[in-house]
Structure formats: structure tokens, C-alpha cells
Regions:
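Cytosolic regulatory regions built on CNB/CRP/Popeye-like sensor folds
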Residues: 1-112
Length: 112
């Protein structure tokens, strides 16, 4: 894990990027923007102590949204390999549930 600091307006990742890390927002504001959003306001807002960027890592697929800092922000980044090592130690039922939930969210987004 590593601590990263971002400035307001800076992208943490963009839609289409390979998901290499999962993020935990420690401080600041991060907006999640779907590719179809041409507005200034995000589709979703990430709050402190919330995780984001997980779907691309869980599914090994390109990111479906962009994450942009709405203020200066500090995040903890967990690499794909660190995440997978933690998941492998988890109960097999929880591993399967995690993948199913992620796929369900992606399917719902694809239908919009």
C-alpha cells in the first residue's frame, strides 16, 4: 500500500485505463464521472473512508469511469497484486460474492 496526494482537478484514473490499483479516500473530495457525463458535476461522489476503483481490478477489465479530485485529496492505493493476495486468503464464498456483485454493477451500468 502507498499513500498518494493529489491536487484539485487532478485525475486519479480515467475511463478506459487498466485497473491496477484500488483506492481508499483518506481526505478530500473525489468525483466519479461516467464517460457519457459532459457536465462539471460528477455522477457520484466518493466520501472519506470509502473505496473506489475496485471494479477494474476485480474484473480485470478497463475502468468504466474516471476519478477526478474535486479538492486536494489523499488516498491509500492498494495494488492489484496486494488486493489479490488478500482476496485469496478470504473465504471462497466471499470471493465469489465479490466477483458477482462487481459484475452486476457493471451490467447495470452497461444498460444505462
Amino acid at each position: 500500500m502507498k499513500k498518494l496526494d493529489y491536487k484539485s482537478g487532478q485525475y486519479i484514473f480515467k475511463a478506459g485505463d487498466k485497473g491496477k490499483e484500488i483506492f481508499l479516500l483518506m481526505s478530500g473530495d473525489v468525483g466519479i464521472f461516467l464517460p457519457t457525463n459532459d457536465k462539471k458535476d460528477p455522477n457520484f461522489k466518493v466520501g472519506e473512508n470509502e473505496v473506489f476503483g475496485e471494479m477494474g481490478v476485480i474484473e480485470h477489465k478497463p475502468r468504466m469511469a474516471s476519478a477526478r479530485c474535486m479538492s486536494d485529496a489523499t488516498v491509500i492505493a492498494l495494488s492489484e497484486s496486494e488486493f489479490e493476495a488478500r482476496v485469496e486468503k478470504a473465504d471462497p464464498f466471499l470471493r465469489a460474492l465479490l466477483r458477482i456483485l462487481s459484475q452486476t454493477v457493471r451490467n447495470l451500468q452497461d444498460k444505462k
